[in-house]
Swiss-Prot record:
It comes from Nezara viridula (Southern green stink bug). Mg(2+) 2 binds at residues 156, 160. Binds 2 Mg(2+) ions per subunit. It is an enzyme of class 2 (transferase). InterPro entries: FPS1-like (IPR039702), Isoprenoid_synthase_dom_sf (IPR008949), Polyprenyl_synt (IPR000092), Polyprenyl_synt_CS (IPR033749). Coiled coil: none annotated. Its EC number is 2.5.1.68. This is Farnesyl pyrophosphate synthase. GO terms for biological process: farnesyl diphosphate biosynthetic process; isoprenoid biosynthetic process; pheromone biosynthetic process. Its cofactor is Mg(2+). A motif (DDXXD motif) lies at residues 156-160. Mg(2+) 1 binds at residues 156, 160. It catalyses: isopentenyl diphosphate + (2E)-geranyl diphosphate = (2Z,6E)-farnesyl diphosphate + diphosphate. Farnesyl pyrophosphate synthase involved in pheromone biosynthesis by catalyzing the formation of (2Z,6E)-farnesyl diphosphate.
Length: 403
């Protein structure tokens, strides 16, 4: 059943009319967070027909990716670097640079995207295909996804002039890097396709993978570009429709769809309907994930998330900003308009205080609970051939995250 219909069944008619007065019940799920106010919060907290996560009917608690999986995945990284550097024996300084770029920008982080490829393949492939050779290939493809992540982060940090990433200075802020970070990022991106060719060119799914990765790069670039040109003070850009587009392209495709679709092709799953169903769920997870990111950028613990939030001072088109402007009183709106997008620490604090005064954190937590349950129910509607446990695991690891 489409998630929009599930949403309509879960929410009362008064709340539907309040949140979507012009849609006549035909709501796009990604707009669930649009126009939530005190009435919706009150409904969420007291209506017995909304099932919170603790009352989920899911019988099987999703598994998690194990420490052994992480250890085995990391053990492949030196071989990845070796593959990328041994092709340049006559240019030793370039090989050294590529190794340094990879170590700094790819090997860190939680590696959730890469591990998702491996976990998804284990869940999707038939038993006879789970050979050491294929598991290793899944790990290599996982590193290809991690390399795209590193590529996007280097470019994004440079464009945003961010300060820290994963607990240390952004790559471009290193004294010997600077604007060269742009070409360094391209080395990471080109290395991704080098690995795909080196390890998969004789496989049946090679062309599908190349097209999948190229599509992820193109869509993510669209999203990043629109994100950079949608900053305040152009208040016409602070709309939920624009935000949904940015989120879908900037985050959802490469964070959730790419890893699972990679594993599906590797497991021999080419059925277009199964890919469509998986994509639908995964893009919704990506939207959910980005809303969480927006919240953590403002209210997260910098020591835990490993970076200093900059969305307020950059005037980003974020879920928090849109909800705040929609719910603000005239005086609160005046504060937001005069302070949002400023690098002045006092004005940044005023924006945070105003977010709290408006009740944005409470709206976010209501959104998070409702969305978790709605996506859970969409997962339960997936066809055979798409193991529910796989998608529930991804959702479970996303819910309530602090980094």
């Amino acid at each position: 059943m489409p998630l929009a219909k599930l949403c309509a069944k879960k929410l009362s008619s008064p709340l539907m009319k309040l949140c979507y007065p012009n849609l006549n019940g035909k709501l796009p799920f990604s707009n669930l967070s649009n126009i939530l106010d005190n009435s919706s919060l009150k409904f969420h907290s007291c209506n017995p027909h909304i099932t919170c996560r603790g009352l989920s009917t899911v019988a099987l608690r999703p598994q998690t990716i194990t420490k052994d999986d992480k250890r085995d995945f990391m053990a492949v990284f030196p071989d990845i670097v070796r593959d990328l550097t041994q092709l340049n024996p006559g240019i030793s300084d370039l090989s050294t640079l590529i190794s340094k770029i990879m170590q700094y920008n790819v090997s860190g982080g939680k590696k959730v995207r890469g591990l998702t490829v491996v976990y998804s393949y284990r869940m999707l492939a038939p038993d006879h295909a789970l050979t050491p050779e294929n598991i290793r290939l899944a790990q290599i493809l996982g590193w290809c996804v991690e390399m795209l992540q590193g590529f996007f982060l280097v470019i994004d940090d440079l464009a945003d002039q961010s300060i820290t990433r994963r607990g240390r200075p952004c790559w471009y802020r290193n004294p010997d890097v600077g604007l060269r970070a742009g070409s360094d990022a391209l080395l990471i991106q080109s290395g991704t396709f080098q690995l795909l060719q080196q390890h998969c060119k004789d496989r049946e799914f090679y062309i599908d993978l190349v097209e999948l990765f190229l599509d992820a790069v193109r869509r993510t670039t669209y999203g990043q570009t629109l994100d950079h040109v949608s900053s305040f003070p152009n208040i016409t850009h602070l709309t939920m429709d624009r935000y949904n587009f940015i989120t879908k392209y900037k985050t959802s495709y490469y964070t959730f769809h790419l890893p699972v679709a990679t594993a599906m092709y590797m497991a021999g799953i080419y059925n277009t309907e199964l890919h469509r169903q998986a994509k639908s769920v995964l893009l919704e997870m990506g939207h959910y994930f980005q809303v969480q990111d927006d919240y953590l950028d403002v209210f997260g613990d910098e020591e835990v998330i490993g970076k200093i939030g900059t969305d307020i001072q950059e005037g980003k088109c974020t879920w928090l900003a849109i909800v705040a402007f929609q719910r603000a009183s005239p005086s609160q709106r005046e504060i937001l308009e005069s302070c949002y997008g400023s690098k002045d620490p006092e004005k940044i604090k005023k924006v945070k205080d105003t977010f709290i005064e408006i009740g944005v954190p409470a709206v976010f937590h209501a959104y998070e609970e409702e969305t978790y349950n709605l996506i859970t129910r969409q997962i339960q509607q997936l066809s055979q051939g798409l193991p529910h446990e796989l998608f529930l695991t991804l959702l479970h690891k996303t819910y309530g995250r602090k980094q």
